Amino acid sequence: MSAEIVYSTDALIDLDEAWDFTVEISGDPDLAFQQVDALLEAVEGARSYPLAGSRLDVVVGTPTDSRYVVAGRLLAVYSIEEHFNRVDRIFDTRQDWVSVLVRRG
């Protein structure tokens, strides 16, 4: 059975900002839609196989049960809950996303 996917407020804001950033640097809204769509598909893949995402603790160097998926230049950090997967944050891979997450913790 597939888990429901829930996006945090931060993740939804991040998604908008990722789209804006891609349009700003590329000048191509279609490219931004393609990148966002690819990330949403990767997150959807984690619905059925939540452990398929990479372990975040290996990257940030601190204990966490969170995982992440990457699609193109976008990355989604998610937590596996009992009945759903919560997408906590979304980053452009060109950001210093590890520092953002370490400061959060």
Residue map of PLM features:
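Glycine-rich, flexible loop/turn motifs
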Residues: M1, A52-R55, D65, V87, ...
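Generic structural signal for secondary-structure transition and capping sites
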Residues: D20, G27, E44, S48-L51, ...
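Residue-level detector of beta-strand structural context in well-folded domains
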Residues: A3, S66-R67, A76
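Enriched for short, Lys/Arg-rich terminal
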Residues: V70-G105
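Arg/Lys-rich, positively charged N-terminal/basic patches that mediate binding to nucleic acids
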Residues: M1-A38
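A short, surface-exposed loop/turn module that caps and links secondary-structure elements
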Residues: E41-V70
